[in-house]
Amino acid sequence: MFNGIHSHVKLAFVNREAEMLELDAAARLGGLLIVFGRRRVGKTRLLRRWMDNRGGMFSQALEGPVEMQIGQIFADIREQLETRIEPRGWEDFLEILGLQKKPWVLCLDEFPYLTARDPSLPSRLQRWLDHGLPDGCLLILSGSSMRMMHDLFLHRTAPLYGRAQKLLQVGPMDYRAFCLACDLESPAESTFEKFACVGGIPKYWEFVEKGKDAVDLAEALFFDFAPYMEQEPRRILSDEGLAGVTPLAVLEAVGRGAARASEIAARLGTVQTNLSRVLQQLQDASVLSRDLPYGESSRTSKRTLYQILDPAIRFWFSVYSPHRSLWRTYPPAKKSHLIHGHAATVFEDWCRSLYPAAGRYWEKDIEFDLVCPDPENPSGLLVGESKWKRLTKAEHERVLRALKDKWSRCALASRHPNARFRVFDANDIKSPFPPSPIP
């Protein structure tokens, strides 16, 4: 139901086959496995689903004192342990795990909560992994803070650097998975515009209802009384330790059309060098993407465009934030127009996702939506233009002629004479005959 009270749809578990196989392989090897990904991407459901199928111990960490954290973990798993002695600290807890007679799998979800309370825990774990972890046992540490997980496991000076047999990143799911999970017709433009509002985050999909259009979905998720998404950007930034007004202000500027660092700085009334650190932090947190023209290196090119990665967060800053005060006064046609414009940017991303190594290219007043190695000609390029509408044959031919003419005027054309051209439109959203969802 809409108007402030919303039903949360129970979704099918879909499209995590690759992650399931990685978890199976990790269980066979034993050791340490790191699972990370932004909040609400589906890490916990994936891990619980996998452990329901194969068995194991699972506990989600609390944000509380160390004694309470250890007590909660022990309470969650004590029925599966061969002891009833309660641990008084981390050393006791790790010793209990080491004394178990049978191989085990233990997942500690929201691991950064534990290290935030006890910064010595990674060093304790390092010693235990090196000397006390029994053969055939698997410890899974999962977390939502991309920056903190990077600092804990990928920084060369971190105690746990190099200790994991695998780092498994759980990413957003794609359009096909969205259609499967929500039981929607994939070729329809209306379905893709719903996807553009929620992106690949399964938690947001729970607000999708059959028979409701993209405007209904946007109002339920963003514009109704106390909407679910109202504080979402702040929650994500808080997870990443990005406090203060500057990260939000940067995202506001990008959402409203500032794509270059100089443009963002101008919107914020500051100099570009003052934003270098926060721009890098937002990239590290997988909130912003930094795009270079196709074929150029980050070490030599100064031409950069920034974009908000997640479609739902992009919608927040490009549609919700600028229009929330007046949204209720807009006629349905204007609301649909705003959503359509946002969906066009997501469709452009979707087109590039069809080709490995695809990117954008731009110079002066020329821009191409897609440039990549041509899968049909290893020595050539595929150059594409995306249009978020169903083009007629005449419209398609007109866009194709304009694309070829634009290519002939760009510097990249002289270095790549073998180019093939393609125009993408809404007709390209087709059902891929996917496998049935896991019940």
What are these model-predicted stretches?
Residues 11-23:
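N-terminal pre-P-loop "Q-motif" helix
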Residues 33-34, 117, 128-157:
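Sensor-1/coupling segment of RecA-like P-loop NTPase cores
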Residues 43:
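Conserved lysine of the Walker
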Residues 55-59, 64-85, 98:
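Conserved NTP-binding/hydrolysis module of P-loop NTPases
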Residues 100-121, 125, 145:
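Conserved P-loop NTPase "ATPase switch" module shared by AAA+ and STAND
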Residues 149-247:
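Interdomain motor-coupling "hinge/lid" segment immediately C-terminal to the ATP-binding subdomain
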Residues 204, 210, 217-368:
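Accessory nucleic acid-recognition modules appended to NTPase machines
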Residues 355, 368-390, 403:
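Conserved catalytic cores of phosphodiester-cleaving nucleases, focusing on short active-site segments
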